[in-house]
């Protein structure tokens, strides 16, 4: 089957790779000059299935009000002048209850755990290297209240069979020796030994090269004008004014999927603006071993070979990619507060990206009511964590194979009248 994948971030490239491996003829189109040069370029670096949680959670509305008056707030909101922003936030608020949170977190952990298994298998099969580390991740709590509040997430982990370790202040240093001088600031932590880390951009670039060897064609520096629709079915896309026909089109354009598809399918994916700095490492002993997530500031600190990636926070401000100096100060503060002397923040590079977020936090992977049109987007802050699983899942569904995990509640159908799509569905039906 001829498949056209729109978007060459980590979601688009993993989709293309697994589709090609299943025997499909795949072409990838992107406006950038190469793979992973937009949202996948400088994310926080962790592959953390156990920490897969919706931003829409009980208590978040009240927290958001308090954050409005904090200097280092993890979430901020500015009206972007669109009705869609208001509708999206209202849908998110409707998910800020215990029942919805538990349901959404279960779906996210399910896909994220599967994805971690997929990247392990991929690594074993191909030897792909991306400055990865398989040493677990650690969430640190600055207050006893935060530590006590982890009980709800631990209950979900136990139901999903995810191994975890609840650590005291002194136990933290055994997992992350670099916290020795700052552990007095912390109440404890939650360690997930099966989580991983790695450079998403490096992974995506190298996987794209492997995909090319499987026959995938990449067309970069190309403007995707529109989809080609004939007889109520998608038959390809208009690219730089040229018709590129296909049996099936996969839209993996991140937060840009929403405006691109607005005349065909309502996709409730909003750009959640995030930030990162990449810090040259100066002292390995004062740096993290893997990923440390600061629960207070919603910031992740990740060790690469000779760099420290510090990323997180969120702004609901629309398609605004201007760099915010205040967010840089927050990132610099958090890494310096927990790992003083580990890196030279004065030489850090600053980046921002628009993470595609659904109101319930769960991505949209699978078919749509429009024949020939499939979607793989909406992974929010967990695109790197969920990429391989989403790509494999999409490939299985397109190929008519039964997926390894439940998939019906991951499709766009959960937002449409009529409910969930079937677990498997012929690609061209």
Curated annotation (Swiss-Prot):
InterPro entries: DadA, FAD-dep_OxRdtase, FAD/NAD-bd_sf. It catalyses: a D-alpha-amino acid + A + H2O = a 2-oxocarboxylate + AH2 + NH4(+). GO terms for cellular component: cytoplasm; plasma membrane. Keywords: FAD, Flavoprotein, Oxidoreductase. One of its GO terms (molecular function) is D-amino-acid dehydrogenase activity. SUPFAM superfamilies: FAD-linked reductases, C-terminal domain, FAD/NAD(P)-binding domain. Oxidative deamination of D-amino acids. This is D-amino acid dehydrogenase 1. Pfam families: DAO. Its EC number is 1.4.99.-.
